[in-house]
């Protein structure tokens, strides 16, 4: 068992029955010229987040944690995004940006596009799971819950973008399904001003989960002895 120093208190978990979840580390969210950038959000400080996620993934994999990568987006015709009868049609900034700039149609968050791809620095490895998701929450219309329950996983460590949208949405839904959620704050980044990051972390540590950081997470894992299963 590993005890992780966190806010509002430490949390103990078995790494080999836990998952590290990397949320939407796609060009869309972390690279200049991607969807968030084109929609007017600041992505200029995402490089350190990418490096911190690399560090967390390496440590988690060595500890026997399952690594799950999410990619947010839809088919090339955006059928999966929903039409005017879906609130997603009206609230998705990617869809709104494409309606304002028709030349971007088919380029933002479309499966197979550069925008949809994970950033070059983050490469899933054999044994990892890569899941597409059509909405903010990674539990909606995906097999995430089944994947976790079938492996006896109850503790989820979150990284990725955006803290205040897809990360928080997935952690909240996990809370309602009886999962313990931890966010590594320096391995996440908000969509919007800095106060959005602070508000999301406040919500998580006060109501829905725990907040720690990459160095503390790696130190906790490295101080734990793991009995390897042959």
Swiss-Prot record:
Description of what induces expression: Up-regulated by the nitrogen regulatory protein C (NtrC also called GlnG) and repressed by RutR.
Class of enzymatic activity (EC top level): hydrolase
Transmembrane segments: none
Keywords of the record: Hydrolase
Domain of life: Bacteria
Keyword DNA damage: no
Signal peptide from the UniProt entry: none
Gene Ontology terms: biological process: nitrogen utilization; uracil catabolic process
Catalysed reaction, written as an equation: (Z)-3-ureidoacrylate + H2O + H(+) = (Z)-3-aminoacrylate + NH4(+) + CO2; (Z)-3-ureidoacrylate + H2O = (Z)-3-aminoacrylate + carbamate + H(+); (Z)-2-methylureidoacrylate + H2O + H(+) = (Z)-2-methylaminoacrylate + NH4(+) + CO2
Keyword Lipoprotein found: no
Enzyme Commission code(s) on record: 3.5.1.110
GO molecular function: hydrolase activity, acting on carbon-nitrogen (but not peptide) bonds, in linear amides
Active site residues of this protein: 24, 133, 166
Function: Hydrolyzes ureidoacrylate to form aminoacrylate and carbamate. The carbamate hydrolyzes spontaneously, thereby releasing one of the nitrogen atoms of the pyrimidine ring as ammonia and one of its carbon atoms as CO2.
PANTHER family in the cross-refs: ISOCHORISMATASE-LIKE DOMAIN-CONTAINING PROTEIN, PEROXYUREIDOACRYLATE/UREIDOACRYLATE AMIDOHYDROLASE-RELATED
Family label: Belongs to the isochorismatase family. RutB subfamily.
Name of the molecule in the record: Ureidoacrylate amidohydrolase RutB
Species of origin: Escherichia coli O150:H5 (strain SE15)
